[in-house]
Amino acid sequence: MTTDQHQEILRTEGLSKFFPGVKALDNVDFSLRRGEIMALLGENGAGKSTLIKALTGVYHADRGTIWLEGQAISPKNTAHAQQLGIGTVYQEVNLLPNMSVADNLFIGREPKRFGLLRRKEMEKRATELMASYGFSLDVREPLNRFSVAMQQIVAICRAIDLSAKVLILDEPTASLDTQEVELLFDLMRQLRDRGVSLIFVTHFLDQVYQVSDRITVLRNGSFVGCRETCELPQIELVKMMLGRELDTHALQRAGRTLLSDKPVAAFKNYGKKGTIAPFDLEVRPGEIVGLAGLLGSGRTETAEVIFGIKPADSGTALIKGKPQNLRSPHQASVLGIGFCPEDRKTDGIIAAASVRENIILALQARRGWLRPISRKEQQEIAERFIRQLGIRTPSTEQPIEFLSGGNQQKVLLSRWLLTRPQFLILDEPTRGIDVGAHAEIIRLIETLCADGLALLVISSELEELVGYADRVIIMRDRKQVAEIPLAELSVPAIMNAIAA
């Protein structure tokens, strides 16, 4: 924290935002000091995103006041918030990937003379701006030639150069590896030391303790508390977030007896040139096979080839003992395969559609649109899964975009469970959801396994994989490089295999 550590720069008083049947923010008081990194934490549905959107003009609060440097403000939109001095950088960088770094840094405010772009001057200023934070790169190169971490750094530098006094970083490390995270943290510390105030939204608690000065916790739309990071034990932080003790029972797995030795799905030398090297994989009823590896190792590509999103061009696939050609997701679904993708918002949910409509989607697609599911049956199905999976929603007709990440994930699980699959692929099932929902999702995974479902689970949460997987396959450079049996399964064993 800077020498102005006690000088408040941003404050909300009684901030409230309501949606039909939901108090997204309820009388929230929030305070941010000049030159500090504030972690903003809470379960999904706690109100973090709503608070950010209220601060940046995406939403207009129904009640309460926002104060910036002692002045009451009411941002009309994100551009107005930026003019006032509040900038935001999201996990998915909101820049123009095909344009140069310099173009992205100065888009909308390019140096011109007589109406003509002064490109050399812009590139010089862009180089100087990046160098001022210790980054040396060719600003003439397209942004998409750089890593996700560097793209985020460019977005941050742009926001700061636009005179941001407060910078909100929303899940900036979700797609970064360890080295990239440290690169980002170095920049965050530089900004803090220069007097910029940062709000850091994340689900990674270890990172909170690495980089933040204070922690604010929200729960169910309400302010729970704000504490100095160095004075808050992690177990107490979890209690603040959950309002209860963390249920660790779901993270502990007893031994499991497989229901059958015959694989539900078996793949031999199965692969797709340019996507994933040929691999062997068998999954049996009641078995959980984990898939581990670094980002870009080929985990998601493996799932996409199996599910027919990127059809294989080599090898054989046996589903319930019969050779099959998995050429499309529809064909895979008909054969009893389900797939919950990593990116819920892009590849999973239909944001504006209701919970009911999202749940019945896969079953309706399998039946065909000439055999519609009646509205009464849809309602009964949705109510049954809301009850069975504990989906928190005011009604079956609530647009799914207003549900928390954990509840969206449960809706996606419901969608595929409704089709009664025999083989289900889960890609990062607990990513982007809170610590409490983690345990709930893992409990669901265990229940599905006990019911005889064959599961392939892709996860970066190694402790979780060790907790529930029967064996773990290791991916590296889009190849299957190792398999760790249950007797040898541990976090160090997985990490050593990944790094070998």
From Swiss-Prot:
It is found in: Cell inner membrane. It is a peripheral membrane protein. Keywords: ATP-binding, Cell inner membrane, Cell membrane, Membrane, Nucleotide-binding, Repeat, Sugar transport, Translocase, Transport. GO terms for cellular component: plasma membrane. It catalyses: D-galactofuranose(out) + ATP + H2O = D-galactofuranose(in) + ADP + phosphate + H(+). SUPFAM superfamilies: P-loop containing nucleoside triphosphate hydrolases. It is an enzyme of class 7 (translocase). It comes from the Bacteria. Its EC number is 7.5.2.9. Residues 10-245, 259-497 form the ABC transporter domain. SMART domains: AAA. ATP binds at residues 42-49. One of its GO terms (molecular function) is ATP hydrolysis activity. The complex is composed of two ATP-binding proteins (YtfR), two transmembrane proteins (YtfT and YjfF) and a solute-binding protein (YtfQ). NCBIfam families: YtfR_transport. Belongs to the ABC transporter superfamily. Part of the ABC transporter complex YtfQRT-YjfF involved in galactofuranose transport. Responsible for energy coupling to the transport system. This is Galactofuranose transporter ATP-binding protein YtfR.
